[in-house]
Amino acid sequence: MSKNERMVGISRRTLVKSTAIGSLALAAGGFSLPFTLRNAAAAVQQAREKVVWGACSVNCGSRCALRLHVKDNEVTWVETDNTGSDEYGNHQVRACLRGRSIRRRINHPDRLNYPMKRVGKRGEGKFERISWDEALDTIASSLKKTVEQYGNEAVYIQYSSGIVGGNMTRSSPSASAVKRLMNCYGGSLNQYGSYSTAQISCAMPYTYGSNDGNSTTDIENSKLVVMFGNNPAETRMSGGGITYLLEKAREKSNAKMIVIDPRYTDTAAGREDEWLPIRPGTDAALVAGIAWVLINENLVDQPFLDKYCVGYDEKTLPADAPKNGHYKAYILGEGDDKTAKTPQWASQITGIPEDRIIKLAREIGTAKPAYICQGWGPQRQANGELTARAIAMLPILTGNVGISGGNSGARESTYTITIERLPVLDNPVKTSISCFSWTDAIDHGPQMTAIRDGVRGKDKLDVPIKFIWNYAGNTLVNQHSDINKTHEILQDESKCEMIVVIENFMTSSAKYADILLPDLMTVEQEDIIPNDYAGNMGYLIFLQPVTSEKFERKPIYWILSEVAKRLGPDVYQKFTEGRTQEQWLQHLYAKMLAKDPALPSYDELKKMGIYKRKDPNGHFVAYKAFRDDPEANPLKTPSGKIEIYSSRLAEIARTWELEKDEVISPLPVYASTFEGWNSPERRTFPLQLFGFHYKSRTHSTYGNIDLLKAACRQEVWINPIDAQKRGIANGDMVRVFNHRGEVRLPAKVTPRILPGVSAMGQGAWHEANMSGDKIDHGGCVNTLTTLRPSPLAKGNPQHTNLVEIEKI
């Protein structure tokens, strides 16, 4: 057998094992590995005391299983899932470099070990150790005072995604134990949206009534895959295996893959058939140019549009819409703007050549089924709501919705085993704000209104935010926009009067705490974690404490139970219901078993560590029931159909207060934005800047692990053409700046990014002298981003920025 013949049959297990050993050799600087690796592993096996199942439950969503080897109450090394035969559709849930480095997080010398109170100014990071009693008494006293003086609407649970997978440990504010505690004590100000998906989650329901997409594995049945800003090789690189499933599904279908992105991503990386670099924020213009070709060359699915859609042309336009207010008129230039959306028009905006737009339109119009999807980068723009709905128009125009191998234009859906979560109870406070608007609510809350600021539940806020819970999240500073402005707001103690931070490390956000509490990590306590982004295989992971509690670190449930005691016996009883954390897990799992008898018992799951189950329906096809019978299975839109023209959006556009450069439209149109590709500000700040998810971090989690920082340097990507103009060579230290702030970091000069565009991995820890020059040496992109929200969702537009870059 030849060498080539042997390589054809290489397994995923062998490949990963061999590359892992090779990586170790490289990390050791060329040090030769011994050939007694197997014997050494056996020796370690004999010496260890136990292996404990854990999970990495940070907000990449992959939620990978970990097998932690423990000796003398210390984690000595980490491996990942090794169960099953590891085949397509039933693969091992393997961790990436982040999860595999969790030992370095657990044993990190900078772990928080004791309760502390602030003794300097907020943001200085000056604290002194206090007892748990003092910390808990202070929190309870401040909470009582806030509620008595301002009411429960003045209490806010900060957006957090540091622990998204946990049940008892989950940090998502709408589903956390903190939310349950506050609902036992009169409630707190609600929030809507997310930093990840605010615009698409808001916009897509106006079209479809929901935000569903076909599963990745359904690409087995596709002839063409078109990905707008979707980069699972970095955003969903492990665990559930979206990247792996994408490649295996394409092997089966031989589908052509076209990647549309300003950056040549790892999802492309030689696997794509074509990369089309596009200016950030112009995806809707590309869609319009494609639509012009589809319409003029009779490539639209007219029967589908007539039967299932509202507002494509005059035939299905709602009665309350203006004449020529339909989508076809907009594309052909017969609408209000009198501009035909030709490929030439689209090319001038997007930077994609006219002939390539025409070719792409014909490919989309003739390849059926076509899987057209979008990641969450395109929607994280100031015009992101319009972009999300616009991309959905391509499968709508071509009739690819509701069929196997097609898609809705949304991101891929996944099969998940539904778990019974800790009930948070009802919130007596019905007012809510966008999760991105909390700094406004601190600074000028009573001035925030429903029609200008997106306040829901009442016409305006009555009080500003005075008390903040910040549990397992870095959005207080690092992941929020315009850090310098946010610093000014938080440092003013007359505004927000109490900030409680519950954390593992002294993060950028923790420095602003008044009371700082040391939390256990998820792997240090008992919990059950379900999969999230995992194709058509769901799983549950049972976490057991990897070590005993160390120093004075405590689990979140204990912390909140102790606060509840201090708020009154009725609050304590309502919060705990007389149960410990373990008893809650057993109680909730019993409810799961009652609904899903196929699950293993609690003790069996605990012994197994991980339980896997394939989707019994095979591939998930979004809106299939609607496609099969639209009358029996209407969508959750007012018409029950796909609403290309939304009367609800027309009413919002008519009644809301908007800035002159903001657009809310009943149609999925293209609109330019502030700090966009054609902004006058480009004369001063000529480069567009966006952030991307970096493989060494999940947002900011793992951002303090030295090994990962060394392996994946924080850099600003810049095209060679732009670099040459500025005298910048690869690796040069540069300053990236605009009117909001300045960041200093190395330059990555690469043709993998479009000229006129720059990019930085988001989530790097902010490092600046906030009482001095405020220059960020950590490379945090949010030093440069804006607090101005998007028009409809009031979401974060952290990819809409203009900067200049100069060599230092």
From Swiss-Prot:
* Residues in the signal sequence: 1-43
Q: Which residues bind [4Fe-4S] cluster?
A: 56, 60, 64, 96
What is any one of the record's Gene Ontology cellular component terms? plasma membrane
Among the GO biological process terms of this entry, one is: anaerobic respiration
Q: Where in the cell is it found?
A: Cell membrane
Per UniProt, the enzyme's principal EC class comes to oxidoreductase
Q: Fill in the PTM field for this protein.
A: Exported by the Tat system. The position of the signal peptide cleavage has not been experimentally proven.
Q: Where does Mo-bis(molybdopterin guanine dinucleotide) bind?
A: 196
Listed SMART domains: Molybdop_Fe4S4
Q: Which cofactor does it need?
A: [4Fe-4S] cluster; Mo-bis(molybdopterin guanine dinucleotide)
What is the cofactor note?
A: Binds 1 [4Fe-4S] cluster.
Keyword 4Fe-4S assigned to the entry: answer is yes
Offer an example of a GO molecular function term for this protein.
Answer: molybdopterin cofactor binding
The EC number of this protein is 1.8.99.-
Q: Give the membrane topology.
A: Peripheral membrane protein
Ordered alphabetically, the record's keywords are: 4Fe-4S, Cell membrane, Iron, Iron-sulfur, Membrane, Metal-binding, Molybdenum, Oxidoreductase, Signal
Question: Which CDD domains did the record assign?
Answer: MopB_CT_DmsA-EC, MopB_DmsA-EC
Ranges for domain 4Fe-4S Mo/W bis-MGD-type come to: 49-110
SUPFAM superfamilies xrefs? ADC-like (SSF50692), Formate dehydrogenase/DMSO reductase, domains 1-3 (SSF53706)
Pfam families in the record: Molybdop_Fe4S4, Molybdopterin, Molydop_binding
Gene3D superfamilies in the cross-refs? 2.40.40.20, 3.40.50.740, ADC-like domains, Dimethylsulfoxide Reductase, domain 2
Q: What does this protein do?
A: Terminal reductase during anaerobic growth on various sulfoxide and N-oxide compounds.
Family, as annotated: Belongs to the prokaryotic molybdopterin-containing oxidoreductase family.
Q: Mind telling me which NCBIfam families this protein's record contains?
A: dmsA_ynfE, selenate_YnfE
Q: What name is this protein filed under?
A: Putative dimethyl sulfoxide reductase chain YnfE
Q: Which gene encodes it?
A: ynfE
